[in-house]
């Protein structure tokens, strides 16, 4: 049969690349689950009253090459001026060995948060290195494995200061007036919901204010001044005030550690350790505190523990502080963080080592000294005598200076009265400094760089003697060993080999949507047109970004059924927080600010109650019925009981139990009836796209996990992106920004993230995904995700009961396997099964969430039938092994499950187990073998013997 030209062009080719099962395999699976077609299957599963008649109109699919060409043209509209704006963002030189072997390597960017440490030792080691860098530079005792950005880290520091403060009646937080404006913006937003009074004043006046529980200082002020705060900190500590200091990683290479000056908390951005500006992110924040406050710290902390054989092994420590366990009582709502970016910064430090970092920092400072000396010779005045990399230069004709800068394609900081700010960085050259002289002085200045360099080298006093670092940094061997590219490449590969990522096997984590992150989607994030823009550059220089973001927003509006989208939240947890703030401010605009009750189903993810608490709401739990659905009677009773104060409900759809609840519209109607708003958590949006939508269902606001449904990779624990979609009445209440006006959003609300568009440089990933899939491809992806989950459930249900199902015994895009009956019969737990799956070459499903004693499986649409069958075969083989334990063939205390995972060295070790070595390490044959490098972690030992810095190299060997 002759094909048409349209058929030969095959514009939907990417759909077949993204979706795992081909048409024939889909039909085999449909036959297995008893459905005629994808439409018939989804028609059976999804409630009729919420099914869309036609898919959202987001255009036809484009090929990978056409989409890349289209986006390249859009990116070309961005203007890459040389940026000296500073304010926490600088140009960087990302070492190519790290660019190629980490940022562009799916072995690093497709991994998940290291909840399963046995398959995560590589990135855990890199994160431990990041913590060591943080400890060395800050001079404190305990560091986290990254937070979302510097501004949110400041807000977390404020919240932590209140938690640990002994001044229980104090309710005021002092912020020095020269912190970055975006930091102050986010702090004010967070303080409002906590009921804190924020005082902004000159740091010297901090002691003049009473009832202050915490103080935020910035070691190098926003306009460049280095502060010696040691005396002030000492006086504040005498008053029992918790002191937080914002600092700069590169400056700390030369400057005294704030921890040594008495600071309780030190935080900042690790961006300038190799991570491009990317129009605002993603970037990792660092966060450190005194040991006495460790259990009040936010975010992930990597600790050193031991495995079952007594060998050194790494794990996430003190997880009982976190939202997935403590819910509304958690230290923070942070779920993921910025692992990929923290690891880039970590390896940047490893690659350069202490000598290289000092060379870079000294070069930056020397060029700044040269610039300062030349300007002062010509009569210009500097606002600050002490500086590291930033000058605040008073100019008589500011407009003329800025005009010359624009003509030279240079951006200076322009928001300072009668002055300009100039921040140099590791990319700055002597030629750049000469060009800056031309901009500030005109072409006939007559200054000579070499002459100025000699003068500066003999007499530089721009860093106070008291502020010069006098201790060694990064003395651990890991920072002094891998400085040739060969050594660095091999070190990074050795770490990568320890981990299990999507480039090796399916990661069937329920509620996580570990789908394909296609190469074509990833390519644009390293284009300089996207990577090199400062987030506060003039808007006319970012027209490409604005066009891309506008198109993506328009597509997301259509896919969600909402009226507007805000791109600022840089994680799903931040999206929840921003959405709840929009609801809060909406009620306040109607003189109903007393509405503060948030209804949350018992099955909800831990971020929901944690976010509600952060937004200043009180959580009331709604019961679930025996089928796992929201108990409508309990909902009505509690909505009516709290009618006067009902703010909202937070509900996930399909439910966290993996079912399309039939009564979701009724849930929305009940809440609206009593004056509340409906927050629909977008965690399971991958089962909605093209089939239904939150807006069509009746919700008012949702966050979207772009790192789930829309293909941004998880990065081993971040970056994420959590934009919110809202109905029109909530649009005026989404986050704004104090530095940059967000076009199209008429909002005066405070910011929730440091940058106006959050982690803007990863938005091209989602743009590419939607552009290449088109309307039909997006719908088909949701349908195949549902098919894959039902195929697994139907084949495993006789071996492992499926805990919750909807109509006709179907599940949505994930299923919960109930291990509790097996545990009661045999003593084998969900943990044993999870660890045994490692021997079969798989990452475990989600354990004990949302129900203790279960495994939640989400295969996504990207896994083909062969991989699904391999997983099913592994689960059935494990069930047969459990039966061996039940029959007494293997004792409960010594069998392949309780001893899992097994490592390579056991092949040649003494063997006294009642099962063979082959059963231990090759249960599925040798073809798909993954070798973990440690045995099962000893969690109790790790928390009782907390150690969160680098261990001797020999311990890794």
From Swiss-Prot:
EC main class here is: oxidoreductase
The record's GO molecular-function terms, alphabetically, read:
glycine binding; glycine dehydrogenase (decarboxylating) activity; pyridoxal phosphate binding
Which key words tag this protein in UniProt? Oxidoreductase, Pyridoxal phosphate
Q: Name the Gene Ontology biological process terms.
A: glycine decarboxylation via glycine cleavage system
- Which cofactor(s) are needed, names only? pyridoxal 5'-phosphate
Sites bearing N6-(pyridoxal phosphate)lysine, chain numbering: 708
**What Gene Ontology cellular component terms go with this record?**
cytosol; glycine cleavage complex
Q: What InterPro entries does this protein's entry cite?
A: GcvP, GDC-P_C, GDC-P_N, GDC_P, PyrdxlP-dep_Trfase, PyrdxlP-dep_Trfase_major, PyrdxlP-dep_Trfase_small
Its family remark reads: Belongs to the GcvP family.
Q: How does it assemble?
A: The glycine cleavage system is composed of four proteins: P, T, L and H.
HAMAP family, per database record: GcvP
What protein does this entry describe?
A: Glycine dehydrogenase (decarboxylating)
Please name the gene that encodes this protein: gcvP
